[in-house]
Each structure stands twice: as C-alpha cells, then as structure tokens.
Amino acid sequence: MTDKMQSLALAPVGNLDSYIRAANAWPMLSADEERALAEKLHYHGDLEAAKTLILSHLRFVVHIARNYAGYGLPQADLIQEGNIGLMKAVRRFNPEVGVRLVSFAVHWIKAEIHEYVLRNWRIVKVATTKAQRKLFFNLRKTKQRLGWFNQDEVEMVARELGVTSKDVREMESRMAAQDMTFDLSSDDDSDSQPMAPVLYLQDKSSNFADGIEDDNWEEQAANRLTDAMQGLDERSQDIIRARWLDEDNKSTLQELADRYGVSAERVRQLEKNAMKKLRAAIEA
C-alpha cells in the first residue's frame, strides 16, 4: 500500500459525530462508476480513483464497526481499524471478478476489526483517571470486607473517598465484570462457563454486504422521501401525512375532503399525484 493510500486510512477520526456525517455525505457510486474507477486504479495505479472508492465506502466501515460496540473499545478506533481493512480491499480489488467492492471489502474490514478487538479487549483499563484509580484500589479492600454494597454503603464509601455515588457504582460494576478468555476449549461446559468474547465476533463465513447495502438503500430512500415531501405543496403534504405517515390516526378520504372543502374524489386524485411524485423520487 502506498504512503498516500495509507494516510487516507489512518487519518484521525476526530469528532466522531462529525466524521460519521461526513462519511454518510459522500455519494454512493453506481456499478458503472465503481467499475470505471476500479479499472483506473487496477490498470493505471490512479490514486484519485482510489480516493473516491475509499471515501464512497467509509459509511460501510461505520456500519460494520457498530456491531463491535459491546467490547468497551473506542468506536473511533474500531472505525479507524476498519478503514485500514477498506484500504487493503481497495488495493486488492479486481474489477474483472464481477462483484461489487462492498461485497469484497466487508471481509477485509471485519478482519482488521477482529484483530484489533482480539488484541485489545482484555487490556481495557478498569481505572483510567486518578480518581478512578484511587477508587479502584480502595474499593477492592472495602469489598473484601463488605461484599456487594447496598445504597447506604455506596454513599458511605463515596464520602470516605471523596467521589460520587455514581462513581462507586460504576467502578463496582467494572470490578464485577469477569476477565474472560477469548478461546474456550471444546471441553468447556457452555452452561457453567461465561461465553468467550470470540463467540460474540461476527461469523466470518457470513456475507453481510447485502444487509449493509439494504440498510444504506433504506437510509438513502428515507432522505429522498424527505426531500420529495418538501417539494410538494402544503395540502399534498398534509394528505400524505394523514393518509400514510400517521400510524395512530389515519384520516379517511372523506375526512380530508371535509377539511379542504372538496370532494373525496378530488382528495384521491391529489393523493395519487403526490404518491407518484414521491415514488419517482425514491426510485431515482
């Protein structure tokens, strides 16, 4: 991987919400656009083509990384590792294979995230701040004496250590969490042993590309629907909301006819025309 390509994957994520908005703002590529760019990269080493392929697929990395949020690892780091996998996939993608890039890249993205989780999950810090470290070491001694705290004991410990009750409860929960190994042997009794984190990882034999594409299409369709609704006149918007979007209190044609002083047939025509415009916008 060239230094320029690598730098794209390793760019600081910064503010996560802003990053995700930026990733989702990049337009998706059609199959023809994707193939043309992939051919430029594959046959001519065109880094601008590589950049466009990467940026248009960042949203998929975000989508995949969300599935690993339960390990207590920073979401930004999971995304960044997934970006490295995306970079590797783009570099190795052969446009002649006949599959979309996302179908090829999803396995590379997940492989990098898996590696990061396996490398870091067990060393997630229980105490990261000075106050937490003080609480951790003192709480360990106190718990040996008192066991699991009731509310009065929580408040007593909080006063003694100069922290909040919330801090005590949070640290107590962290200390109670078992440090599970990643691999359980086949002899382990699944009823008596906690599940190893490896069992929570995604099934490598599964292909999530279709699901990701479907979810993304639904998101894009929702955005197009919102834009299309804004393009309708106020009365047509009201008719669509009342007839289709208000699940708890849908209006009949006659109710809307009475509201606007027109016939039910006229409302039906307005509804039909509005739906036609919305459908065209969603399918565009």
From Swiss-Prot:
Major localization class: cytoplasm
One Gene Ontology cellular component annotation held by this UniProt entry: cytosolic DNA-directed RNA polymerase complex
Coiled-coil parts of chain: none
Family matches, as SUPFAM superfamilies: Sigma2 domain of RNA polymerase sigma factors (SSF88946), Sigma3 and sigma4 domains of RNA polymerase sigma factors (SSF88659)
Gene3D superfamilies for the chain: 1.20.120.1810, 1.20.140.160
Region (Sigma-70 factor domain-4): 228-280
DNA-binding region per UniProt: 253-272
UniProt GO BP: DNA recombination; DNA-templated transcription; DNA-templated transcription initiation; regulation of DNA-templated transcription; regulation of DNA-templated transcription initiation; regulation of gene expression; response to heat
Classification via PROSITE patterns: SIGMA70_1, SIGMA70_2
Role: Sigma factors are initiation factors that promote the attachment of RNA polymerase to specific initiation sites and are then released. This sigma factor is involved in regulation of expression of heat shock genes. Intracellular concentration of free RpoH protein increases in response to heat shock, which causes association with RNA polymerase (RNAP) and initiation of transcription of heat shock genes, including numerous global transcriptional regulators and genes involved in maintaining membrane functionality and homeostasis.
Entry remark concerning the domains of this protein: The sigma-70 factor domain-2 mediates sequence-specific interaction with the -10 element in promoter DNA, and plays an important role in melting the double-stranded DNA and the formation of the transcription bubble. The sigma-70 factor domain-2 mediates interaction with the RNA polymerase subunits RpoB and RpoC.
Family membership noted in the UniProt record: Belongs to the sigma-70 factor family. RpoH subfamily.
Oligomer and partners: Interacts with the RNA polymerase core enzyme. Interacts with DnaK and DnaJ.
Protein name, UniProt field: RNA polymerase sigma factor RpoH
Lineage of source species: Bacteria, Pseudomonadati, Pseudomonadota, Gammaproteobacteria, Enterobacterales
